[in-house]
């Protein structure tokens, strides 16, 4: 190996560190040529040039429901603006579809999506990419449906929530789900019945639902080869302790601590005999990334 990358504790995810950026490569190449450390800094305007923003989206959606508001199907066509470089465009297009329907129980779902190249800064994995825009489309669509059916928007959502221990139509497993209790408490605490459609011109009250998925134990590449998302190597030390080599980057989620605790529990060792090395690529096995 000619290059050994040392990872520092920079903190924070939110998609901003998911892409490899040209200036990172430039800094490494310049450092090798100069034999000195190289640092690249940007002013705020330059940050917008080189970083990644959210994908502007045009989403067309048809909701199918009976007279009582039970949703039988959703048809969605999404077109997203990925800018001039690929970045996470294909992944965001995929997420727009698979994250589209939760937390609702949908009878049928059809999705088409496309990412277009434009002469603009690239869009990427910015804060829940692929979920935020589609959630906006679904929630505003539900409001329109409630208006057409003369149904209360909260009542409509309560009628279509997924039950616990079920699955979304796109294949995500649902264990516990507190959305019903949450909506009922919000309705009561907000004074919904006294405010909805009863506030003066220019003021109003609305509702929208969101959700998140936990990817722990789920490889990002869903393929038949079943490759692991992460691997660790354990080395038994002379003092009886264990050194863990992992490529998982601790960006605040506590992976260094959790890995150490897991190994300590399985091997029956005290935590102070566990050492974690996750800072350099020479000694760390492959890990597909830590991101929010």
Predicted regions and their residues:
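Structural alpha/beta core scaffold segments of enzyme domains
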Residues: 1-292
């Amino acid at each position: 190996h000619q290059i050994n990358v040392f990872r520092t504790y920079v903190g924070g995810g939110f998609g901003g560190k998911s892409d490899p950026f040209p200036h990172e490569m430039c800094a490494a190449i310049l450092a090798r040529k100069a034999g000195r450390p190289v640092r690249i800094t940007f002013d705020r305007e330059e940050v917008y040039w080189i970083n990644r923003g959210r994908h502007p989206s045009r989403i067309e959606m048809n909701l199918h429901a009976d007279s009582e508001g039970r949703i039988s199907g959703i048809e969605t066509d999404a077109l997203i603006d990925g800018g001039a470089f690929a970045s996470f465009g294909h992944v965001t297009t995929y997420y727009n579809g698979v994250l589209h329907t939760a937390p609702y129980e949908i009878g049928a779902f059809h999705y088409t999506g496309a990412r277009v190249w434009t002469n603009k800064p690239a869009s990427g994995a910015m804060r829940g990419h692929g979920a935020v825009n589609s959630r906006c489309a679904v929630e505003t669509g539900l409001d329109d449906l409630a208006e057409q059916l003369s149904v209360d928007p909260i009542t409509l959502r309560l009628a279509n929530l997924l039950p616990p221990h079920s699955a979304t139509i796109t294949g995500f497993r649902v264990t516990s789900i507190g959305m019903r209790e949450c909506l009922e408490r919000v309705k009561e605490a907000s004074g919904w019945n006294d405010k909805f459609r009863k506030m003066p011109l220019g003021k109003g009250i609305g509702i929208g639902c969101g959700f998140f998925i936990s990817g722990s134990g789920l490889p990002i590449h869903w393929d038949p080869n079943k490759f692991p998302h992460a691997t660790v190597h354990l080395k038994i030390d002379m003092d009886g302790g264990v050194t863990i080599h992992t490529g998982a980057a601790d960006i605040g989620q506590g992976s260094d601590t959790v890995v150490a605790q897991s190994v300590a529990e399985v091997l029956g060792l005290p935590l102070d005999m566990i050492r974690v090395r996750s800072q350099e690529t020479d000694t760390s096995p492959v890990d597909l990334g830590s991101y929010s």
